[in-house]
Amino acid sequence: MLSNFCDNGLTDKNTIHSYLPVYEMLFAPKRLTATDILEIGIGPIPHQNGGSIRMWHSYFNNADIHACDIIHINDVHRCIVDVPRIHLYTSTDAYTYALTVNTFLMKNIQFDIVLDDGPHTLPSMVAFINLYLPLLKYDGILAIEDVQDITWINDLRAVTPDELKPFIEVYDRRSVKGRYDDIIFVINKYKRSLHLAV
């Protein structure tokens, strides 16, 4: 279970939010086969962050875990610094074309999962889809968490390529813990790959 690897003191994904059951369902089929996972957002609180990065590292034990954040490396919890298979890109704006090209595209890195837990603004979420959807494997999963307003789903759907619109999933968890932003937007290319295989 994903919750077995979650340190609630270092991530809010299982405390004020209720994301772990969704991620367990989405990511379990990829647990042993995933090779590259990306999360934008290590955490804003100095030295009380990195919990989700460590959780992915333990859960996907055959994958390299990539994490981007604008915070300085000195503010990152030591539990994920200089750890094999964890690649940190700090003091970095992840929402730029230059970063995606120079850091990932030119190195032929494609992701099984890309997860946006960044500034939680609509422009950053739109940029995330535009920049990182092309870096997904044919059966990859894109997830944006902490969608601040349910009406933003329409905007995120609008920038999703038409051929992937049938594989959009929205997980509205607001009623679970009373969090206004407990919403995850997903483009599930893994489901598309299963559909094409039939």
Predicted regions and their residues:
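A short alpha-helical cap/connector motif
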Residues: M1-L115, P119-I144, Q148-V198
